[in-house]
Amino acid sequence: MDQPTNCEHIDNIKELTLPKDYVCEECIKTGDEWVHLRTCQTCGATLCCDASPNMHMTKHNHKTHHPVIISAEPGEQWMYCYPHDLFIDYE
């Protein structure tokens, strides 16, 4: 079966929420480091990725069930839907 190219969670995003700062909002509180950052498209939180020791964005998803994130990395233009395990590139 082919993987869908979009889902209702991604279709519901009318305007991207971009990161306000290039820091993990949780790691910065404890002085921890991160590898890459992601921005939640529901609430705008910018948190660290799964390659980072604390995996704050996945923890955020488990707690809030906010479905879609974007990469906050300069030059990267993709989003990810947690419920559908779906990556989508955008322009």
Residue ranges of model-derived segments:
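Canonical RING-type zinc finger of E3 ubiquitin-protein ligases
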Residues: 32-41
